[in-house]
């Protein structure tokens, strides 16, 4: 605490990413309203390569002054240095500071999870039920990554529920990135195996795939339906706008502040909280867009 203002240390990577920026902005708004201030500690990389440069980056977390910090919030999704985040939680515990892990569940702190499975199920079910599609391809995230494998499991479960065959020839790992998604599209077109719909595990891959299909002469959604997942702002600027699913940043931020306030008031918060993902239906699946097209492509 500094004066009468309580301090929240926020730890993450890539604060400049659109999703991270939006959650930090929402969190700051709720924090200020409740007499908190944010001290944001972040790295420019995701600490994946374990280089000397990244080792230097992660030292930013050593700057956390637990003598003035009242609570710690970690955003661990996309951070490829579990030991770094573990050390933050352990250090905070030594000072008796509550820790809230957002996106990743831990036994040693309070966890706020996102309803990814339910949200992703809404997207897939919408394509099957509302549009009657039974020929569906899938561009997943990273192989063996928890969230990616969960979305694959949801996809396969729904195919089985509706007695739709799983097409292994149009199943790809896209690594949550545009380049592998482009390669997947090229493979489908060149081998003449384009399905009626492509479900993508995130918006970035869906936007890239849609653009490549259009470049190759396909119309969306007339020739192929494309859906994403994340609820990114970019989903509203592609043509057509992308059907996706995302969380409310305000709901996430409010949950974080409410949990911190309970912990600091001496109450015992729940160990796990869940923030739901909601379906956002636009015209990449063939539905009427919720708002007038922002970018018509004309």
Regions found by a protein language model. Name each.
Residues 1-125, 190:
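Alpha-helical recognition/docking segments in bacterial nutrient-uptake
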Residues 73, 100, 110-113, 137, ...:
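Hydrophobic/aromatic beta-strand patches that form the interior of the parallel beta-sheet core
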Residues 121-164, 169, 271-287:
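An alpha-beta-alpha
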Residues 4, 89-90, 107-138, 150-157, ...:
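Hydrophobic alpha-helical segments within soluble ligand-binding/sensing domains
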Residues 9-11, 64-79, 100, 135-140, ...:
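Periplasmic-binding protein-like
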Residues 19-33, 119-123, 146-165, 180, ...:
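Short, solvent-exposed amphipathic alpha-helices that sit
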Residues 32-52, 135-138, 156-179:
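Short beta-strand elements in bilobed, periplasmic/extracellular small-molecule ligand-binding domains
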Residues 34, 184-295:
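Flexible loop/turn connectors
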